[in-house]
Amino acid sequence: QSISEQIKAFANEQGFSVEIYQSNHEGDIIDLIHKSKDEYDGVIINAGAYTHYSYAIRDAIEAVSDYTPFVEVHMSDIHKREDFRKISVITPVCVKQICGFGKDSYKMGIDLLLKIL
């Protein structure tokens, strides 16, 4: 079972559904973040390498954060990696950062969103 399938199954067990979106295009991610205000109760975001330098994604999250909570997740512990990976420009505009728990980072993000919502 893929990580996406496991996340969907876990969310369904908790009584709600999830949409999973992946893109290598920063503008597409920003468009989805802007849409989240009207379409999603909460968002779990793993911004990959964009985590470390995309002020555009950070600004998009900040613009909708009054309407939609964002939880930042990473499978690896970014704080135990190379120096440039220890920096997250999106953490300040997210409710919380969860990292270092492998695929369980996503489940922990779902649990946190359930508590917030």
Which sequence ranges carry the predicted segments?
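Short Gly/Thr/Asp-enriched flexible loops that form oxyanion-binding sites at enzyme active sites
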Residues: K35, S54-S65
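Short acidic/histidine-rich motifs immediately flanking catalytic phosphotransfer sites
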Residues: S36-V43
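Short beta->alpha junction loops
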Residues: S17-G27
